[in-house]
Each structure stands twice: as C-alpha cells, then as structure tokens.
Amino acid sequence: DQTNPLAELRHKRTLSALGPGGLRRERAGFDVRDVHHSHYGRICPIETPEGPNIGLIGRLASFARVNEYGFIETPYRRVRKVMQPDDPELVGCALREDIKDPETGELIAKKETRIDAKLVKKIQQLKLKEVLIIPYVSETTEYLSADVEDRFVIAQANTPLNEHSEFVRTRISTRYHSKFDFSSRDSIDFMDVAPHQIVGISAALIPFLEHDDANRALMGSNMQAQAVPLLTPDIPAVSTGMEYHAAMDSGQVVIAEEDGEVTSVTGNRIVLHTSSGDKVYQLRKYQRSNQSTCIDQRPAVVKGQRVHRGDVIADSSSTEGGELALGQNVTVAFLSWEGANFEDAIVISEKLVQDDDFTSVHIEKYEVESRDTRLGPEEITRDIPNVGEDAIKDLDDTGIIRIGAEVGPNDILVGKISPKGEKELTPEERLLRAIFGEKSRDVKDTSLRMPHGERGKVVDVKVFTREDNADLSAGVDMMVRVSVAQRRKITAG
C-alpha cells in the first residue's frame, strides 16, 4: 500500500492472526478479537479494520519491537529504589532511611539527605550491602515482553517528577497486570516512556486522541492512510509531534548520509560535498505508486546550505519540511447550511477548488504487447491503416507517443497492427513475407488507446524487448509501457 507515506509505513507494521497456522475469520470469536491488557504498548488498541477482520489484523504500537524469539516487546524506564555503595549514579540520590554505623550505631546521615561524593566515601567504608534511596526514574530503558511485564508495577508516563526525577506525589496511578490502581512510590518498578506508547503511528497522529470516542478514532486512523498526496502539502497547524518521525520512518524522504555542504540543487538531483567527496542524491520524479498516486520528491535545501547527517534534504509526496502533511489547514464552520450538510455531507468553498488546495496528481500505466501470432507477427509502427495524420501527430517514428504529449479519450498511445486473415501462413509464405516485406497484406489496427473519460499528460515511456528482457511472457516480442499523469480536482462524491 503506497497511497501516501503513512499508508506505506503502517502496511509494514501490520500484524495478522490469519493465514497458515493462524485463525479462520469464521471461527474467530469475540474473545480473540477483543483488546487484551497484554496489548499495552505492543499492539495498537485502535488501529484495526472495520468489518470481518476486526481485531484479527492489528498494527504495532509506536515503540514496540519484535525480539529474537518473535515476541513483541515495549520499552519502560527503570525505577531505581536500591543501589550498591559503589554505584557511580549514587551521587545526587536521596536516602530513604537513616544510615547508621552497624558497629557503633552512630548516625552517619539522616533520611532524605542528598548524597554527595563525601557521603559516598563514608557509606563505602561501612561496607553496606545496599543503600535504600528515594525511588527515582532512571534514563535506562528496558524492553519487556507481556509475560515479564505482568510481574511489575508500572507508573504512567505523565506522572509528575521533580528535578531529580523523583516522584512528587506519594500515591501514584499505576498498572499491575490488568488492574489500574494507586500505589506508593516505593512499590513502583517501571514507568511508561511516553503517553502515546499505547497507540500505533496513525492513532498517535490524531491530536487530543484521548477526547475521541474509540470507534471514531478507529475510523480516523484508518482514513488517514487513504489520503491522496496533494499538489501543495501543508503541515498541520495542530500537530502531535509524531509527524516528523512518521515521515522519516516511511522511507520516502531523502536523508543526508553524512555532514556536508550542498553544492548543487536541481529538480531531479542534489549534490552534497562531504569529507569523503561529492555525494549525488537522485530524486524520484513523477513516479507511479502501487495505488496510482504520484511519488514526486522535491529539494528541501538550497545551494550553499550546511547539512548534518540525518537531516532531510528532499521532501516527498505528502511531506513538507520533513514532516508528514496529509491534508490542508482549512477553516471549518460547525453549522447547518439549508440541509446541504445533512448527516455526513459537507459543503466546501469554491475557492478550495479554484486554488487547487485539494488537487492531486494520479499516474496510470497503460501497456501493450506485440506478439508472434499464428497469422504472423504483430508490429508496433506509425503506419496504421485508415487513421488520419492528426491522430498520429504525437507518435515518433517507431509508433510510440512522445513524453510530454497531452492525450485525451481514444487517443493513440502506441500504434500497433496485427495480421488478419482466416488462414494460417505456411513457413514458405512467412519467409517470402520476411524477405520482401509485403506491405499490402491484410492488417487490422490494434493500437493502444486512452480509455473513455481519461485524459492527461505522458510522463514516462518504457520499451521492453526480448533481447533486453528475457523474462517477457512467452510469445511476446516487445512490450511498451506508457505512464500518463492526470490532475484531479476535488469533486462531489
């Protein structure tokens, strides 16, 4: 699925319970399809198809990964409560209880004292096995699978912390197994890494997702993947911060592989001067995606600009400034309009149509093959019987349309003639025809033409011959593929 960068990304993150060794749609009950507490941070509870596959096909959550055994893991920040006296991270922590000399009973440090390097030395001299500290959230993350996670008490990502990463409150909202509860800070083992850890990429792109009904959020996250790339992408005015990551991870934007300076920028390539020499990045121009949408990369840098490794140097369809830009920022009014917006209908301004705000480019491919038939070989040619000069004005000498030609319904893209006749040719007749090239033979026009109602501009022509492509299907001598780009304005329906 390549409708837009998000569709491509979520296609690659799909999980299915169907197929060999899996379930059958008809046999899968409600229990299998329902959301389970082990999905938390692993499988998105929102992104799933509506229909017979609901709950059987899912998407990976934002931070989930698959481990070496095939189990899905999710990251958590470790909460540290006990430390070894020789731990370098002990400096800056606060004591959970008084420290006394085990031999004399002398008070070394009071409870809640902030540990410094001097106190660490004293503690190490006491030869204590461990030091109890006020729990703090460390920077180390650990990936846990569902069965391991069930053993721990986990705090929410938005739990307030002080400047020392310690819990501000004594009672904290936590999760243990499938129960949500309030726990003391001493019993917490881990903390979520981010609030959107629970949802997938598409759902994480919806602002204020927590205020939406789950059913409508499901529709919204699925419909984002159906958005066709527009002529002028527009970054959302209200974003969630996931737009950059979604665009980068989709693989459609061009990223600088090294630090360097831009020495040349043209429509179809960018040259970067780096410490290891000049690096040329070729851009994809007007390429057809699997869904017939247009993949067109545009430079996002200017000549002389310094770029760093990992910077976006070229945008693709539905991205702007290296961020995902699926739609347009428009003013929406919530009111009745003489019944024209009854139920799920909407009224849009004519200005949006005139300004091409919602205009998209679609590229269709048309193919024709010349075969060796029983009556003789078909031929791709400009010499087509009973066709006026006007119909073949854009064809080259070989009978193939030129790039840049405007075509409409029933226009010839590739001229082709096929032999017609009731009888099969004998080998002798074939030989004579090959030698003398009998022009007056009986042929019919089997040219490739534009379908009814279709029009556009030819953006690419590819010719495949038997000599260059041995994998052409049997009996095919030559194949021509013509790509036609079409601008489509937003229309009713």
Say what each PLM segment does:
Residues 1-493:
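Intrinsically disordered, low-complexity regulatory segments
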